[in-house]
């Protein structure tokens, strides 16, 4: 049968699993839990099964959901979905609105993902209403915003992202239609100039009829009205609304320039007595044509920048087949489906731990779980990078996002929804893209006052050329930009419009986020999760890498290679050691437990287990304490000390055991000692662990890049020296017998000496060092999350040490693109704005037209996004130098 548990819907949404043998609530739950049960179970429930158990999970989830509504911890950023951001000025305005709230400590705004991550001051009690009030302030400032609910189901999150992508695709289609309309008008405007060009070349065609009509000022005015109210309508209205909200953006600048040119032309047309001779209706048409074309190309490039994130999301299944089987069914448990089983299609958010699911060939696993029945091969390349499919049968684990290739499988859900492996990867990538690189502050500082500065420069440009420049440099009126009659008003207005239009805060606003988006998404796709732009920037500047030994340079799958004892049977020593280490999570502890299990040894009962990370584990067996760990630590646990002759004898026995076993230079050997209260050291256990295949390559590549490599280990000198020699780390950079505190201190000393340090580790004893290092890099053995991955800022989910080099290389390439983008954006504005203002006009007789300025403005943004897209061509170091 699939399950002997039945689920009952209760208000609020939760579930009860009942099993009669444990029906006595008073015995199952402490007082606090009983009060929660009474509070939530307002309706009576009835037993319809021959078993009763009240599952604690649903109550905990209900409790947590209620608490999440009441209060959000102040150190956890809330996420706001913000729409309407068009350029760097918009980003700066959104950040300014958020930071103006006294409760806000910091805010990071991402225009590409349309999100704002807000952190509050420690003394602030953050509630859902607090977040909603910030969203309301943004909406009132012209940027529609709403709080993203934390804990939202994975299907809901996928749906939300896909809706955003779909929305961008729809906008791209509309943008193309507007461009087609705008350039039709541009072609008609150009028609009036075509005859002049052909006549100047001696080709006397294109005159009369429609050509003469296109020269008519009223027709040109009509084309300008068509451009402003047709394809340019949304742009103009958005710019006007931004002015009204006191947050002008790029649309405001373009709209102001277009309307200024149109207004002056219209006044000149309807009031000929003014003798302005300022008819340049074609300028708003040409300007909008180039701007809209650039926007369309920019939107296409930004959509393409989300490709890697979309590929990650495509791995998540939002639907699943829940299998319901009768409790009295007698079908063999290894049968995929029984005759009376029912499959129900449900959202993956409705799946709970323990549910039975059916996954057919070609389908994606919706949750993490273990195989209950069936045989198949599974494509796990998205998680492991291994191209060959992996055989799965009863008892094997499967991960969400991997693909079932061959036969149907029935699985039992072990982690669901937002807790599944692929969901955690996606969430970490989203969080990473919300963490701005410190270099972004430069762009923010410039983009904030940018629009007002440009408007001021434009007004100054108009005033200078109209009142001063045209008199000091009269020859400038001979330039085509001044019109056929050399009009100072036409010259001044066009140069002022040039300044408005050529400036581009968009390039500044896109310089960092586009590169960060592509870099973090590409890293996640390749198997290394980088927790944000700030981490990328630090990672790119690393000049020293500290490596742990066990589980980092070695495979992390140690095995017992020898046991020696003093006065005890060897199996007796192994039994005691396994009993003590049973609850420990270190790979060495697991090796001892696995060895005892493989020999079918019955371990004694223990009490009061205590683990001291990096040293060993202590527990009480038969009324006496037994310690397992390093020699010094075990000796210090007990008053009775061993004679030196006993220790020499023990070492000799162990060496003899090891000499009879096959070993190679690629094996690292560690010795742990077993001590007992009142007796001292009673035995020693040798643990062997094979070096990783890519360990030597990784160290060599790091050293080739000029990065200092050091080895930090809590193991004995001999084992550490052997590993260091095999991988190529110098003896002076090898450190052994280090406690977690000593590792932490060593990292601090390296930083004090000026090094930027990355620490690579995998266990709980590495967590302090990972947190202290400039960048902590954690390997995830068998995709299990632990303290190391929680403390690290980079996680290697495929458990490949060579990905350390790849992550460093990607970070350097990403930051290189960021600096290139910022350099381009700043240089473009510094050079183009003075040229647009006419600085070259007196001496070189060169001036831009508004349409040329609009085209350059569009190209500046396209360059930034396209340059970031080149990151997708970046090759990993591993692929360049295949092992």
From Swiss-Prot:
Which EC numbers does the record give? 7.2.2.9
Q: What happens when the gene is disrupted?
A: High-chlorophyll-fluorescence phenotype.
Transit peptide region: 1-65
Q: GO annotations under biological process? A: copper ion transport; photosynthetic electron transport chain
The HMA domain sits at 76-146
Task: Give binding positions for Cu cation.
Answer: 87, 90
> What enzyme category does the UniProt record give?
translocase
Q: Which InterPro entries does the record match to this protein? A: ATPase_P-typ_cyto_dom_N, ATPase_P-typ_P_site, ATPase_P-typ_TM_dom_sf, ATPase_P-typ_transduc_dom_A_sf, HAD-like_sf, HAD_sf, HMA_dom, HMA_dom_sf
Membrane topology value:
Multi-pass membrane protein
Annotated catalysed reactions: Cu(2+)(in) + ATP + H2O = Cu(2+)(out) + ADP + phosphate + H(+)
Keywords for this protein? ATP-binding, Chloroplast, Copper, Copper transport, Ion transport, Magnesium, Membrane, Metal-binding, Nucleotide-binding, Plastid, Thylakoid, Transit peptide, Translocase, Transmembrane, Transmembrane helix, Transport
Matching PANTHER family: ATP7, ISOFORM B (PTHR43520), COPPER-TRANSPORTING ATPASE PAA2, CHLOROPLASTIC (PTHR43520:SF19)
State what protein this is by name: Copper-transporting ATPase PAA2, chloroplastic
Name the species this protein comes from.
Arabidopsis thaliana
Species lineage:
Eukaryota, Viridiplantae, Streptophyta, Embryophyta, Tracheophyta
The record's gene field reads PAA2
């Amino acid at each position: 049968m699939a399950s002997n548990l039945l689920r009952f819907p209760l208000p609020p949404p939760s579930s009860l699993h009942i099993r009669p043998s444990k029906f006595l609530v008073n015995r199952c739950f402490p007082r606090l839990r009983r009060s929660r049960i009474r509070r939530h179970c307002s309706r009576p429930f009835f037993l319809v099964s021959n078993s009763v158990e009240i599952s604690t999970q649903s109550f905990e989830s209900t409790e947590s959901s209620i608490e999440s509504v009441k209060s959000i911890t102040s150190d956890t950023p809330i996420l706001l979905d913000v729409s309407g951001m068009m350029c760097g000025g918009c980003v700066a305005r959104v950040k300014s609105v958020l930071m103006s709230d006294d409760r806000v400590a910091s805010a990071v705004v991402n225009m590409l993902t349309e999100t704002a991550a807000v952190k509050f001051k420690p003394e602030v009690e953050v509630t859902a209403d607090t977040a909603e009030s910030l969203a309301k302030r943004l909406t009132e400032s012209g940027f529609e915003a709403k709080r993203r609910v934390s804990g939202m189901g994975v299907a809901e999150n996928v749906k939300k992202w896909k809706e955003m992508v779909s929305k961008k695709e729809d906008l791209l289609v509309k943008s193309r239609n507007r461009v087609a309309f705008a350039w039709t008008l541009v072609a008609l405007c150009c028609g009036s100039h075509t005859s002049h060009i052909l006549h100047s070349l001696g080709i006397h065609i294109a005159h009369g009829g429609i050509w003469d009509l296109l020269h008519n000022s009223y027709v040109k005015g009509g084309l300008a009205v068509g451009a402003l109210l047709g394809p340019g309508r949304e742009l103009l209205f958005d710019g006007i609304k931004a002015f009204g909200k006191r947050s002008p953006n790029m649309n405001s600048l373009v709209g102001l320039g277009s309307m200024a040119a149109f207004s002056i032309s219209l006044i000149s047309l309807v009031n000929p007595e003014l003798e302005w001779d300022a008819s340049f209706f074609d300028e708003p048409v040409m300007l909008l044509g180039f701007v809209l074309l650039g926007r369309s190309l920019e939107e296409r490039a930004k959509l393409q920048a989300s490709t890697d994130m979309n590929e990650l999301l495509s791995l998540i299944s939002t639907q699943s087949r829940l299998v319901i089987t009768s409790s009295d069914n007698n079908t063999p448990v290894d049968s995929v489906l029984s005759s009376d089983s029912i499959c129900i299609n449900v959202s993956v958010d409705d799946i709970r731990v323990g549910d039975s699911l059916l996954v057919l060939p070609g389908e994606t696993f919706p949750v993490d779980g273990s195989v209950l029945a069936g045989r198949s091969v599974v494509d796990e390349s998205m998680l492991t990078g291994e191209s060959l499919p992996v055989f799965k049968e009863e008892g094997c684990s499967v991960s969400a996002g991997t693909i079932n290739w061959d036969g149907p499988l029935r699985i039992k859900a072990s982690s669901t929804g937002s807790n599944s492996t692929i969901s955690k990867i996606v969430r970490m990538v989203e969080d990473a893209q919300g963490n701005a690189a410190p270099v972004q502050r430069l762009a923010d500082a410039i983009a904030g006052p940018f629009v007002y500065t440009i408007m001021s420069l434009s007004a100054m440009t108009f005033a200078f050329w109209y009142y001063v420049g045209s008199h000091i440099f009269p020859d400038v009126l001979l330039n085509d930009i001044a019109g056929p009659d050399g009009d100072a008003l036409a010259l001044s207005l066009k140069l002022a419009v040039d300044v408005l239009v050529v400036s581009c805060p968009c390039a500044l606003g896109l310089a960092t986020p586009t590169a960060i988006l592509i870099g973090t998404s590409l890293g996640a796709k390749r198997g290394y999760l980088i927790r944000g732009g700030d981490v990328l920037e630090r990672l790119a500047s690393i000049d020293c890498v500290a490596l742990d030994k066990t589980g980092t340079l070695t495979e992390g799958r140690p095995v017992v290679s020898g046991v020696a004892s003093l006065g005890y049977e060897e199996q007796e020593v192994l039994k005691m050691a396994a009993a003590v280490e049973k609850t420990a999570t270190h790979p060495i502890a697991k090796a001892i437990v696995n060895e005892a299990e493989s020999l079918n040894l019955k371990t004694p009962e223990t009490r009061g287990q205590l683990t001291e990370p990096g040293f060993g584990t202590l527990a009480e067996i038969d009324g006496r304490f037994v310690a397992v760990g390093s020699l010094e630590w075990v000796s210090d646990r007990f008053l009775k000390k061993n004679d030196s002759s006993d220790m020499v004898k023990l070492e000799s026995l162990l060496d003899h055991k090891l000499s009879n076993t096959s070993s190679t230079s690629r094996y690292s050997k560690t010795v742990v000692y077993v001590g007992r209260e009142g007796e001292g050291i009673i035995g020693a256990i040798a643990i062997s662990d094979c070096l990783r295949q890519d360990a030597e390559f990784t160290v060599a590549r790091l050293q080739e890049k000029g990065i200092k490599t050091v080895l930090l280990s809590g193991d004995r000198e001999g084992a550490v020296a052997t590993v260091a020699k095999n991988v190529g780390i110098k003896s002076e950079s090898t450190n052994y017998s280090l406690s977690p505190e000593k590792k932490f201190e060593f990292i601090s000393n390296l930083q004090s000496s000026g090094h930027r340090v990355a620490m690579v580790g995998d266990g709980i004893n590495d967590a302090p060092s990972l947190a202290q290092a400039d960048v902590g890099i954690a390997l995830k053995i068998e995709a299990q999350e632990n303290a190391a991955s929680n403390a690290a800022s980079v996680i290697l989910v495929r458990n490949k040490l060579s990905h350390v080099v790849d992550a460093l290389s990607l970070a350097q390439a990403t930051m290189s693109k960021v600096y290139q983008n910022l350099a381009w954006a700043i240089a473009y504005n510094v050079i183009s704005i003075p040229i647009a203002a006419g600085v070259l006009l007196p001496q070189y007789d060169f001036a831009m037209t508004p349409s040329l300025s609009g085209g350059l403005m569009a190209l500046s943004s396209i360059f930034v996004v396209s340059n970031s897209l080149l990151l997708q061509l970046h090759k990993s170091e591993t692929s360049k130098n295949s092992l």
